[in-house]
């Protein structure tokens, strides 16, 4: 089997570390690994498959010559600055930031939904969608295969880790401070997250939606090549890891609960967990660190014959970031399009 030379850019971050775990867990075929980071991260040593690798500082040079694929999770500014440095020698850049997602000449890919889009990448860049979008479209694809989805209303319940490792630490610290009767530290979120939910993820735009909510609208339409209408409300909740979403869809024809269950059960990347009578439904507590999108609480909309409601939970650092990117590379390798 063809083995690749792989780079990870931003390896010291939460997603960068997840790249290492996912590549190992999936036995990704590679014979060389190069790690890149900022000047602060340069010199750090990480172990992968029993070998130690030292982080190199990301610079404008020829370090990417000979590298087949680069998994990049270093922020949009870094991605934009180093795009040509990474791709100029033919490296496929799979980027986890929002920098290129809506660029017409950059494919936005979820392998369970639109893998072929990854083959058309004139700039050598493939964008990883936002974590909330990935989770939703994997589930939507199963319903879209039954009947065209006209519109979606979705509310998200997003874990603290979606804002980074320091956000998780702040949530833990807040609980500790409050239990001691101390004033909680509030730096990473607009308000105290402990014992609270915050209907505010990313910054607000002129139309009243946040950037996170608009990502779900714009990205879903691009990925699904659809005129689908999406209205999202994104909420931060005091959960450590794994996002949840309550999703309502309106389809062109009525879809029964039985049809939907069968479609989800057979869908790629989905696990059906829908036995409410036995208190069996997806929850972040049990989904964290798992690969699939879990779907449950499937029910007909009692006010709209063409409406269907369901609940999804997925690990946003895995499927919502690192795993999706690695699956893109696996697809390119499978069809012989990576080298």
Where on the chain are the PLM-derived regions?
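Charged docking surfaces used in two-component/phosphorelay signaling
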Residues: 70, 160-339
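N-terminal Rossmann-like NAD(P) cofactor-binding subdomain of oxidoreductases
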Residues: 1-193, 229, 293-294, 298-303, ...
